[in-house]
Amino acid sequence: MQKGFTLLEMLIALCILSLLLMLALPTWQQSSQQNVLQKEQQKLYAFLRQIQARVENSSDIWFIMASRDLSGKRWCLTAQIKNHHLCDCLVPQGCPQHVSAHFYYSAADTMLISKRYYPLELTRLSGIRNTASTACFVLQANSQRTLFSFFNVGSLKLKDNQSLSACVNDEE
């Protein structure tokens, strides 16, 4: 008798492997989305805290503005000292040298959702009283979302999928 596998045994093994992969793929994709979101939220939180630290050491009012390009699937933030000229992070070359502006550019596969986009400010931070205007926005990676909330006492909080309706327009 010859040793080896029959065609039927090979097909059964292939079928079992296919079923296992079909069950594992959604879980793997979900964890991949979660990793993308966590990485981006850590970088964005660090940027916002760095800007808050700059504001605390100044007596100026700073604006934080969000810009996004839906066709290019990209977004960015501008943090700048209050000035009559507002800088757009999607067109940084249009920002004059005398305006102190800092830009944050997102990684791929994430989107920012807010009710206010450039030229409107997302929030304003005051160095005199260490306060912020109350505002929020959502960071999204596919179906995974994180809410960023600024409170008037100057704090910044992150929440997972809570109270999104106050920060998201209905048409998005």
Segments (PLM) and residue ranges:
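N-terminal helix-rich module
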Residues: 23, 29-35, 42, 53, ...
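N-terminal single-pass transmembrane signal-anchor helix
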Residues: 1-29
